């Protein structure tokens, strides 16, 4: 049965307009993005099929083009649309964070860092640069690849902190495995960067590790 033949209250688009996006299932949200199904398969049925094939909504959203395009109903055009939507979401969070007078909400920082790093298929390391009132100056990804004390150069972090005229920084990196548990290498790296930045009077406020669930704060664990 075509979605057009469904009761209006059950159609994803009408349901979203009446109840808000949070009321929709992953499949219903994806169906709105897909817009149409394929022969013998409504957009909602296709969405359910895709979620089953990828294993989760997150896996679908983070898929790279070659894998994404192998699935029925998807291709380069849909991939481009999806990347545009994800980038708009990241920029929205960045703009919202910059509008805040100061970083008074740890949750706002967590939400922002999740949006920036969770989609990354490989390890990346970045810095959130702040002024003396902890207002956001910039966020930059500085290193990509295996993140450890040998691959992250304190001199480069210091250079970018000075270029942004930062008074403080929040360090962050992701664990693509999804496990947020800090390693000994993470603790060593954090201390090296704290020592280097202290020489130019820039404070390291925290180091967040992004994986599945909520980003982990090393400061909250007492490891700063």
UniProtKB/Swiss-Prot annotation:
It holds the Pfam family UPF0758_N. It comes from the Bacteria. Zn(2+) binds at residues 173, 175, 186. A motif (JAMM motif) lies at residues 173-186. Signal peptide: none annotated. GO terms for molecular function: metal ion binding; metallopeptidase activity. Belongs to the UPF0758 family. This is UPF0758 protein Pmen_4376.
């Amino acid at each position: 049965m075509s979605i057009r033949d469904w009761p209006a209250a059950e159609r994803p688009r009408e349901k979203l307009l009446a109840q808000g996006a949070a009321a929709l299932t992953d499949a219903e949200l994806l169906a709105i993005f897909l817009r149409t199904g394929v022969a013998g398969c409504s957009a909602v049925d296709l969405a359910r099929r895709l979620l089953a094939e990828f294993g989760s909504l997150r896996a679908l959203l983070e898929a790279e083009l070659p894998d994404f395009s192998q699935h029925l109903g998807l291709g380069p055009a849909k991939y481009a649309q999806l990347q545009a939507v994800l980038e708009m979401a990241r920029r929205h969070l960045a703009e919202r964070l910059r509008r805040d007078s100061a970083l008074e909400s740890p949750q706002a920082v967590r939400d922002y860092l999740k949006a920036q790093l969770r989609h990354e298929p490989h390890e990346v390391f970045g810095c959130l640069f702040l002024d003396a009132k902890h207002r956001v100056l910039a966020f930059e990804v500085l290193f990509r690849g295996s993140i450890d004390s040998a691959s992250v150069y304190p001199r480069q972090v210091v250079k970018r902190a000075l270029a942004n005229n930062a008074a403080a920084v929040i360090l962050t990196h992701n664990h693509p495995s999804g496990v947020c548990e800090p390693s000994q290498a993470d603790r060593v790296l954090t201390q090296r960067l704290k020592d280097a930045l202290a020489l130019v009077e820039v404070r390291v406020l925290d180091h967040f590790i992004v994986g599945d669930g909520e980003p982990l704060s090393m400061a909250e664990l007492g490891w700063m």
